[in-house]
Every structure is written in structure tokens, then in C-alpha cells.
């Protein structure tokens, strides 16, 4: 049965249609927010997947180019590989949804979101987040929802709920918050050094709006919701846990995990697993879930150590950061390099500079974003965790980590006018034991400064974890979590920022939400740790951006010309600009506003190219002197190229102070000559002279002017 539900959301109409399309999905919501239309569906398999120890949730977000009136490029004219924005949207939908499914549920679940129409003022990403929550809530899939999401901007100190496209361009914050009925379950933010208290207030402003949306979803579920289906639990039998505890005591397990060396811990657990396999040999049913059992035993042990004994697996205090180290200039011929080490996590970052034409071209749904000048790429090779796997290119995790560090650094980068370069930083994970994305922020800052990029402030990143008990008041926030505390804990709260405020947040949790006190403590902890890293580790290594670029980096000089003369510089079919490039070996970028960036490794050739361009766009007037090349000879005189496509003629009588019988007696094709403009007639023809007396007059005038 088709039903439609509507509410006002930030001054725009949100309409949810149920039963109109996709009737065979477990749940489907046809979402309309303003003129944005997204189809969100939730579907589950009828049986659990065998042989896995995780919940197999897949989230898809498909950006259809017809939604913005475009036909895809390429030979096939079809949408291809998911864009970076689509991948990041999948991750931001996944994070609030995943904790709300049962932990022992092993049926495959797919959340599909198809963007069918885009209103720039109504975010399709937000619409898909709401659509996935609604589709799952009304389906028969077990789900502890609903949840809702809201975006918040900050303009002139005022919070803007679900900002429009124009508002996003001037906002100091891009915050997305997802909530359940009582708690915050997901935070994603980019910000222009926003103070911590303002960020906290914005988070809970969004949380208030989310409660209105949840009440709206409740009305939809009340009318259209299906009864949740029963499922086969994959929980480990208590009898097996009891048997394992008799073979390996809690004290033995605690001793196995209590070490600051990741590989030693893994070796200890492998020995315990082998001991259990030998003891339980013959019981195939128990052996099939032994791996999950050992994992759960480790988890319970680590959580008890932290929450009850205030003892972390590597012996650190609750607020203590692992050993830190930083250095720059590891690679001699790259444009900039920096390495940041935190315990057994190590990132080597390399910075590369290029002309603005090398900026990444974007062909997505956002008409305001057609290119990206700063790119941060994150790589995670298998050797960083001591494993052997073939390299298959970046996955969703790598793209997400790269984007988080990129978002943290964008607010401190110089503008294209101040620093006319495209910038790429690449974070290579050398070693990993938690928080590699935050180490990437620190390493990127080091390499940018080493490369001479004049960033406004240094940026550092740190992550906090969480272990909770049975009540909201029973919890412990951990500063600088390592991998084990991430795996077995309840939260990974990543914050990047400067001494002035926050530039990026990403919060992942495994429980049903966080209270305000936990969020406030986590943000306060990350600020304290960030300031320590900036002042005691990074600044002693490099206190400010270098004043000069690497000798191996391209040099760029910028001039501005009259936009109406861009065509003169480019020439018919690009002949003029290509000739300049061929002659000087530089790269030339021209924008519609008349900005000209000339890039090359030889500064003399850059200056030569600028001289040529200046000659092309300069209005030639009588009295001006040029150094030109003879390009054509006639019996009545010679033609001299003053600038590309700008020739002047020297009459034979003006070639010398003496009488000239033949032009070739004075000049030949290819000769470099100094000439003076005597006249520019009404037809634009330029008359020149080489007479010494004429040139001397000009030189005398020039010398007088210099004085």
C-alpha cells in the first residue's frame, strides 16, 4: 500500500514515500528533500553467511549523472567506478547504522541508495542517510533504530541547519551528526579552526534536530513497519567459554595481552589458540567457533583490565601518549618529506608541488566543486602489519583515511593566489598499530612545511578511545588508543586541529551512542594531547614553513593580463601559446579572470616566457623600444617580430643612419635587432626604426627616467 509522509526540515519539505517503488526489497523509502530525490532500500539474505565472524553489511551510494542533467563521458557512456565522494558517503551512512544491528547477526544486509535527482540546496548525502535509516526501520531486518542525521554550518557565529549550497561556500564548519533517541552515534566534521566549545554546542544543536526527525520516523514505522524476523544467533556457547577458562585462566590471558609489542602479543595469542585446539580436539562444533571464542576472551580481558583496574595493555596511564618522534627531509630529491612515529605506528609523508593545471578534475554531482587543488592520498601496504597480501589499489578504508587527513589540513593551506601550486601529499604507512590516519595528519604537516608550503598553522591529530560498563556513568576515556584498544573498545574519536581549534573530526563507535559528558571529555582530551604533540614533538623539528622551495620543485611566477587579451596569448588553435611553450619549455596556465601562471624548473626561461606574454598583451605605442627577430625581408624593408603575432616593419630608409642600397646589407632573417616604434597607424600597422640617432634619443630618455 502506497503511503506518503511529510515534515518541514530546515525550511524545506522532506517527503517519504513508502510502497510506491521497490516493493520486493525488505524496506524501501522513496525520499524527496526539496527537489532532491533518493531511493533508499534495505535488503537482507534469508540465511546467515557461514564461516564468518563479522556482520556482513554492505552500503552502496550511486551517483547517477542524469540527476544533474549530465551524460557520462567515456566510450560506454555509463556511470563507472564510484567517485571519492560516493565512497565517503557510503562510509558516513555505514557508521551510524552498523552499531544498531544485533552483534550476533550474520545475515548479509545491503543498504542501496540511488541518487535520482539533485537539488543543490538539499544534500543528497544527508537524504541518503535518512533514507537508509527509514528503509531499515520499516523493514523486517532486526535493527535497534531509528537514527537520524543533520548537517550544521557556522556563518558569522550562527549555526545553520542543513545549509544550502551557497551557505556551504562561506561556512566555517561542515558538520554531520547522527543520533539515536538519546545519544549521539556518529560525528563527521571539517572546520576552520573552530574552538572546541563551539563544536560541542553545534553537535548537540544537531542532536536536538535529530530528535524531531526520529519522531517523524516513528510515525512512518507505526503505519508501515514490518515485524522483525527471527534469526539464527552466532553467539559463542557459554559452555565453550567455561571450558576455555578452565584451560587458559584469566590470569594467563591477561599476561598474554599485557605487552607494549604488538607482535609479541600476537605470538602469545597464537600459542594460546594452539593450546586450546589441542585440548578441544575432536569437538568439531566447538573448534568451528574457537577463533571467535578466543577473540571474545581477549576482549573481555582487555576491557576488564582497563575499566576495573585502570591498566592498559601496554602499561600506559589512561591519559598517556605513546613514544613520539618526528623528522623531515628523509628523501633527498622530493619536494618535501616528513615522518611521524607514535609507538608502533609510523607514517612517511611525501609532498609534491605542481602547476595548478595538475589539480584533480572532478566530474560529480556538486556543480560548485569542479577541481581539487590539494590532494592527500593514504596507502596501507600489508607489510605495515606484518602480513603478505597483493596490492589491489586503495579501498574504501584508504580513501576514507586519506580524506580525513585532507580535510584536517585544508583550512591552513594558502590560497591559490598566495601560493599558485597544486599540492599532493602521500602518506605511506610504514608500520601500523592504531591511529594511522592521525599520524598522517602530523606527517603531512611536517612534509608541507619542509616543502616550503606557507601553511597558516601547524596541524596535529590524535585519537581517543572508550570502554563502557553497564551504566552511562561507568566509562573510561583513553588517550591515544593503539590497535588492540580500538578493536576491543567502544569508540575511535579522531580529532585534528591547530592550537586555535578543530579542523576535522571523525567518530566511530560500536555501541548505541555517546552521552554529552563522554563527548566533552574526549574533545578536551584530544586538545590536551594535540597541544603536547605540536609543542614538544613537531615544532622542535621544524618551527615554520621553509622560506624557499626545494631546488627540484617547479618554480611558478604569476602575472595578470586583461581578460580580453587571453585570445591573443593563446592564438588561433593554440598556436601562439604552444610556440611559447616550445621555445621556453615552461608550462602556462591561464584562467578566465586573466591570471597567468608560468611554471618551469629554469627561472630564466620562466622570465623569458613572461617577457613574451607581456609583449603580446602590451599596447604598442610610438617611442617604445623592443628587442625583436627579423622574420621576413622585402625589397622595401624588413619585418621584425616584436612578440608572437605582433610584427612591425622597418622601411629600408630606417635601417641605418647611412643610405642602404639593399636590405640584406644590414639585416638577414633570424637576426636579433633593437628597434624603436615610430608610429602605429590607424590600421594597427607598426612602423619601426633602427637608426642609431632615434634609438639614442630613447635611451637617453630612459636613463633620465631611471634617475
Language-model features: where?
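Extended amphipathic alpha-helical scaffolds
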Residues: 1-30, 34-45, 53, 230-369, ...
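Short, hydrophobic beta-strand segments
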Residues: 113, 185-190, 231-235, 246-256, ...
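Conserved phosphate/anionic-ligand binding catalytic regions in large, soluble enzymes, centered on
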Residues: 27-29, 122-141, 328-351, 433-454, ...
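Flexible, glycine/charged-enriched surface loops at secondary-structure junctions
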Residues: 103-109, 144-146, 213-231, 263, ...
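Glycine-rich, flexible beta-strand/loop modules in the N-terminal catalytic cores of phosphate-handling
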Residues: 25-110, 115-122, 188, 330, ...
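Long, basic N-terminal domains or extensions that often function
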Residues: 1-232
Amino acid at each position: 500500500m502506497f503511503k506518503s509522509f511529510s515534515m518541514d526540515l530546515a525550511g524545506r519539505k522532506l517527503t517519504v514515500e513508502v510502497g510506491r517503488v521497490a516493493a520486493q526489497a525488505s524496506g524501501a523509502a522513496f525520499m524527496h528533500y526539496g527537489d532532491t530525490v533518493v531511493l533508499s532500500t534495505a535488503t537482507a539474505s534469508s540465511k546467515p553467511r557461514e564461516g564468518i565472524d563479522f556482520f556482513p553489511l554492505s552500503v552502496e551510494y550511486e551517483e547517477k549523472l542524469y540527476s544533474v542533467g549530465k551524460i557520462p563521458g567515456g566510450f560506454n557512456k555509463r556511470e563507472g567506478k564510484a567517485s571519492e565522494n560516493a565512497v565517503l558517503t557510503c562510509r558516513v551512512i555505514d557508521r551510524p547504522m552498523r552499531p544498531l544491528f544485533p552483534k550476533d547477526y550474520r545475515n548479509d544486509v545491503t543498504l542501496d541508495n540511488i541518487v535520482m535527482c539533485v537539488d543543490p540546496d538539499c544534500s543528497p548525502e544527508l537524504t541518503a542517510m535518512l533514507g537508509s535509516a527509514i528503509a531499515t526501520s520499516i523493514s523486517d531486518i532486526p535493527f535497534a533504530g531509528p537514527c537520524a542525521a543533520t548537517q550544521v554550518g557556522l556563518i558569522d557565529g550562527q549555526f545553520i541547519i542543513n545549509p544550502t549550497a551557497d551557505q556551504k561556500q562561506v561556512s566555517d564548519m561542515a558538520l554531520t551528526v547522527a543520533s539515536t533517541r538519546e545519544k549521539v552515534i556518529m560525528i563527521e566534521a571539517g572546520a576552520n579552526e573552530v574552538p572546541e566549545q563551539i563544536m560541542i554546542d553545534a553537535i548537540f544543536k544537531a542532536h536536538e534536530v535529530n530528535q524531531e526527525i526520529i519522531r517523524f520516523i516513528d510515525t512512518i514505522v507505526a503505519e508501515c513497519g514490518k515485524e522483525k524476523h527471527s534469526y539464527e544467533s552466532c553467539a559463542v556457547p557459554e559452555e565453550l567459554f567455561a571450558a576455555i577458562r578452565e584451560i587458559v585462566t584469566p590470569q594467563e590471558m591477561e599476561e598474554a595481552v599485557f605487552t607494549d609489542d604488538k607482535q609479541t602479543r600476537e605470538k602469545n595469542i597464537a600459542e594460546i589458540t594452539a593450546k586450546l585446539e589441542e585440548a578441544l580436539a575432536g569437538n568439531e562444533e566447538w573448534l568451528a567457533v574457537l577463533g571467535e571464542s578466543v577473540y571474545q576472551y581477549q576482549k573481555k580481558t582487555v576491557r576488564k583490565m582497563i575499566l576495573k583496574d585502570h591498566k592498559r595493555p601496554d602499561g600506559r596511564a589512561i591519559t598517556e601518549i605513546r613514544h613520539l618522534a618526528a623528522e623531515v627531509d628523509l628523501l633527498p630529491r622530493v619536494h618535501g618529506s616528513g615522518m611521524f612515529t607514535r609507538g608502533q605506528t609510523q607514517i612517511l609523508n611525501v609532498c609534491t608541488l605542481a602547476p595548478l593545471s595538475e589539480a584533480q578534475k572532478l566530474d560529480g554531482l556538486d556543480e560548485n566543486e569542479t577541481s581539487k587543488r590539494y590532494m592527500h592520498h593514504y596507502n596501507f601496504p600489508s607489510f605495515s602489519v606484518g602480513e603478505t597480501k597483493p596490492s589491489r589499489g586503495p579501498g574504501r578504508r584508504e580513501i576514507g583515511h586519506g580524506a580525513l587527513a585532507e580535510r584536517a589540513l585544508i583550512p591552513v593551506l594558502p590560497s591559490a593566489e598566495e601560493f599558485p601550486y597544486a599540492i599532493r601529499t602521500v602518506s605511506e604507512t610504514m608500520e601500523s598499530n592504531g591511529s594511522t590516519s592521525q599520524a598522517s595528519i602530523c606527517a603531512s604537516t611536517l612534509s608541507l612545511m619542509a616543502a616550503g608550503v606557507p601553511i597558516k598553522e601547524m596541524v596535529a591529530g590524535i585519537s581517543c578511545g572508550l570502554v563502557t560498563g553497564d551504566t552511562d556513568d561507568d566509562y573510561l576515556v583513553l588517550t591515544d588508543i593503539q590497535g588492540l584498544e580500538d578493536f576491543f573498545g567502544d569508540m575511535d574519536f579522531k580529532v585534528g586541529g591547530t592550537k586555535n581549534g578543530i579542523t576535522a573530526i571523525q567518530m566511530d563507535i560500536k555501541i548505541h551512542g555517546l552521552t554529552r559528558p563522554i563527548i566533552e571529555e574526549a574533545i578536551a582530551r584530544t586538545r590536551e594531547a594535540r597541544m603536547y604533540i605540536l609543542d614538544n614533538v613537531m615544532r622542535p623539528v621544524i618551527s615554520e614553513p621553509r622560506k624557499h622551495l626545494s631546488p627540484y620543485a617547479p618554480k611558478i611566477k604569476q602575472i595578470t593580463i586583461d581578460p580580453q587579451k587571453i585570445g591573443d596569448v593563446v592564438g588561433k588553435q593554440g598556436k601562439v601559446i604552444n610556440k611559447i611553450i616550445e621555445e621556453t619549455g615552461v608550462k602556462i596556465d591561464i584562467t578566465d579572470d586573466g591570471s597567468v601562471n608560468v611554471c618551469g624548473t629554469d627561472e630564466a626561461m620562466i622570465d623569458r616566457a613572461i617577457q613574451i606574454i607581456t609583449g603580446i598583451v602590451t599596447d604598442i605605442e610610438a617611442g617604445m623600444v623592443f628587442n625583436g627577430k627579423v622574420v621576413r625581408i622585402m625589397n622595401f624593408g624588413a619585418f621584425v617580430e616584436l612578440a608572437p603575432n605582433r610584427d612591425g616593419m622597418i622601411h629600408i630608409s630606417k635601417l641605418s643612419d647611412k643610405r642602404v642600397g639593399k636590405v640584406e646589407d644590414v639585416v638577414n632573417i633570424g637576426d636579433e635587432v633593437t628597434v624603436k616604434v615610430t608610429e602605429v597607424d590607424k590600421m594597427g600597422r607598426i612602423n619601426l626604426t633602427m637608426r642609431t640617432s632615434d634609438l639614442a634619443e630613447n635611451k637617453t630618455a630612459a636613463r633620465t627616467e631611471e634617475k
